[in-house]
Amino acid sequence: MTSEWWRTAAIYQIYPRSFADANGDGMGDLAGIRSRLPELADLGVDAIWLSPFYTSPQKDAGYDVADYCDVDPLFGTLADFDDMLAEAHRLGLKVIVDLVPNHSSDRHPWFQEALAAAPGSPERARYIFRDGKGEHGELPPNNWESVFGGSMWTRTTNPDGTPGQWYLHIFDSSQPDFDWEQEEVREEFRRILRFWLDRGVDGFRVDVAHGLIKADGLPDYTPPADAGSMGGNQHGLEGGVPLEPEIHDENVGAPYWGQEGVHEVYRDWRKVLDEYDGERILAAEAWVDPLARVAKWVRPDEMHQAFNFAYLETPWEAAPLRSVIDHSIETFAAVGAPSTWVLSNHDVIRHASRLALTADSLQGHGIGPKSPGLPDPVVGLRRARAATALMLALPGSAYIYQGEELGLPEAVDLPDEARQDPTWFRTDGERYGRDGCRVPLPWESDAPSYGFGPTDTTWLPQPAQWAEFARDRQRGVAGSTLELYRSLLAERRARSLATGDLEWIEGFGDDVLAVRNGSVLVVANTGSDPVELPAGDVILASAVLDGRTLPGDTTAWLAA
């Protein structure tokens, strides 16, 4: 890899509570992660990204942080983190950790101090407290609706028992938003960055990187019907044409997403990271439209990468895929950044299910047994394998979410009483939420909890079908999804595809993408009808080929 390793890296997302459990309490932990790192090095990824493991009440699976500079006992200790980090570096893996700057837990010492302090105090200034509307302040300060459902405001109770001010929380009421106009907040996060950089981490994935700053005056806002809960356009495409609205000053979207002032924060953070050697990076989770706006987060003096959610949200159709690939590369190149590519993460339906849905499912809503348009699992896995084979042939950096290398589908049939996503509770079960993509991984088909841990205890129940997806059933088995991923990553590296240039090849029909990247010709058939492959030795394919015929929902790499 080049010194700018992040430009080409294949980065594997670990959701710690669901990856591997070393102590048998049903919750994944840092010792479990450390024990399985050789499997990831063998898979062929370049780096790992860890979702939050910080001290937390776990009201939102760790994205409600009570102490940014310590490890929650659920996951271990700082010593366990240091051991895991050292082992990753020994294996040649970079380590990126999640950082959650938009909000803290309501159990964070600062917020507890704010609740105990008077309105207008320095303690309350760290968060966004406001008096309510109405004759007695009984109404929220504005009409904003939480990402998880319900009002974005919660009223406090004064020490004497009378109703008090309201505080803002874009997400759950247990996640109060910081006031990023306050220098004390900014200085605290510089300290947090340095704490982890000094320990040796290679970078940060920044949660809700398009949040933090709110519009002056906190004006009322009603999002359009097609808006995603996290800020981007919900579907991304219309009639096969990417929705790329022009950027105007008046077209800024929600007053709590993508405000211009957030870029000052990241320019400041970039200066902190540049004090350290080893190309430490910032990766933005920024759900904004269009891609030209996303590119603002990765200008040369800001962050290094931004997740390409436009690509993730693109359907398995040739024309929109080609459009978003071209537009992504062009848009990010204009600011000197690589495009990233991602198909799954801990907030969306796994792509082995999502790509076969026959009805829309809004981002963050999830699917369950009563959802319309539930996927055919055979079709879903076939499309997922083909989509991954296309993604890993593209230049730039690619993200892989734990379990997708096993072909895991969304766990649809979780019992209601087992669900833990705040979305499920705040919408009274109207939205299933994200639990289905967070179920603990299967490692060994015949072991307790399918090898996730030494006991049968798991924080979310594992479906019985997990046995057939277990890693030990796929390791070394030709044609398995695990071996497909290993081959794709090995060939991607050997043939320098991450630094290549694309040349589209015409003449294969409306449902087929054919693109040359260096020494590889990639042919992806998104339709149902088979097509004849051009000349060239087949390097690999996402499904079994019939001679020189490429079946539907299949991608092949050929020697160009």
Where is each model-derived feature located?
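A short, gly/pro- and small-residue-rich
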Residues: A541
